[in-house]
Amino acid sequence: MQISPLLENLMEALRALPGVGPKSAQRMAYHLLQRNRSGGINLSKALNEAMTHIGHCRSCRTFTEEDECNICKNPRRQMSGQLCVVEMPEDIQAIEQTGQFSGRYFVLMGHLSPLDGIGPREIGLDLLQSRLENESFHEVILATNPTIEGDATANYIAEMCRIHNVKVTRIAHGIPVGGSLEMVDGTTLSHSFAGRRDVSL
């Protein structure tokens, strides 16, 4: 059956989203056209505005429509002396929701992966080096993912920080709150034992 070229284009465009295959794209397209045209128009406007105006913060590399994001511009954040290194911009949002960190960030946009041709420069470590040289940090917190690549990236950055005499810490990894030991994998359990701490009463 021959369908509208515009509908075909819409379905193909929706497939740019992660996890959306042909069937999902078809369902979304028909839903927007049949039941939610105003939502589709709003989506189109928001997508166009975001793609046109959102860039990267010159300091931390997160997404922002300004030259520098609100976190980097915040004087209170600047005074904290802490820098948290994360892999992706969405990691910042996850950390901010905890309310436990009041410093600034640096976004790698990935992790070291020599087999894929991703070296230090590809994840902005030259820019991080510049920040360590030109700004005053008393602690760098490494919040990369607990994967082989994340660990390798954290170790590389830790060495950079030591050269600049900056304290380096890594966020703890272990058993999730409410989790059961029998359901936890061996690697996570090993991290939990390695990161154990004293019980204060």
From Swiss-Prot:
Gene from which this protein is expressed: recR
SMART domains (alphabetical): TOPRIM
Name of the protein in its database record: Recombination protein RecR
Zinc finger (C4-type): 57-72
Keywords per UniProt: DNA damage, DNA recombination, DNA repair, Metal-binding, Zinc, Zinc-finger
UniProt domain Toprim: residue ranges: 81-176
The species this protein was found in: Actinobacillus pleuropneumoniae serotype 5b (strain L20)
Annotated family: Belongs to the RecR family.
SUPFAM superfamilies cross-referenced by the UniProt entry: Recombination protein RecR (SSF111304)
UniProt record, GO biological process: DNA recombination; DNA repair
Cited function: May play a role in DNA repair. It seems to be involved in an RecBC-independent recombinational process of DNA repair. It may act with RecF and RecO.
Domain of life, per lineage: Bacteria
One term of GO molecular function: DNA binding
InterPro entries, sorted: DNA_Rcmb_RecR, Rcmb_RecR, Rcmb_RecR_Znf, TOPRIM_dom, TOPRIM_RecR
Pfam families noted in UniProt: RecR_C, RecR_HhH, RecR_ZnF, Toprim_4
